[in-house]
């Protein structure tokens, strides 16, 4: 028996990052997936997409006037918190009223999206993504701090280095590789490199096997952005039992549940990271990762039934829907 076809509409950069592939794997159990890679200012292939009864939008979604043409479809959207930028609370409210009017169903990978939607009548599914744990990290068997920092141009070494006592650090593995379109500030302080034993990775691209090899040698992961839609590198680090240091915003402050798992900071943080929290709680982090992964395995089963439900169209006063 052949599978139903599903239009999977994704942001074009994810062709390379493959950040939406974990959802493709889930959806492919039920559907034959046809990818549409959307890029801003390029023509939307309306006629092709309109042939599908089921549509899944990851990260991106088309403007309201376009989405209105798909009202009789079964649509599920997984927005990313770090990509939702509203001019003010008024436009935020109007946006979610439009999503509600279209009956689009929403997966929420962040509590911040729940707060953004507020009380709008939108059918949602709250999920926390975790991957299968793999506890082989050699560094976690040692009584020293080995730090990995992938500098993506969003956070600098100076933003978090003061959180550590210098005597506790064995080495810092530093990979300067910015996000597309982001200009990095050079970190070329020779004395700092010597004092903190900073080891540079001078590559433009790090294959996944090399990336995971570094994880094996480090027990602390510095979250590279101030906010995330999901934070796939964070999820990978959690699966290795690493101690996560993250800025106080989504999704870091959701994944870091207590000080045995990681450390949350902002510009006003003066507290230092406790050496014993890193070294003595590896077993706790392992159990925490296993527990949360098992929850994910159960919860992800709700995705396909939600997608297959017919969109619930809600009539709204027309003046609310004239924006965008």
Residue ranges and their predicted role:
Residues 133-134, 141-194, 198:
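Conserved catalytic-core segment of nucleotide-activated headgroup transferases in glycan assembly
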Residues 243-246:
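Short hydrophobic beta-strand element within catalytic cores of glycosyltransferases
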Residues 267-319:
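A charged, aromatic-enriched C-terminal amphipathic alpha-helix characteristic of glycosyltransferases
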Residues 1-61, 249, 264:
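N-terminal pre-catalytic "stem/leader" segment of glycosyltransferase-like enzymes
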Residues 212, 235-239, 253-254:
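Short alpha-helical segment that forms part of, or immediately flanks, the ligand-binding pocket
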Residues 82-83, 88-106:
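Membrane-proximal helix-turn-helix segments that form the acceptor-binding/catalytic region
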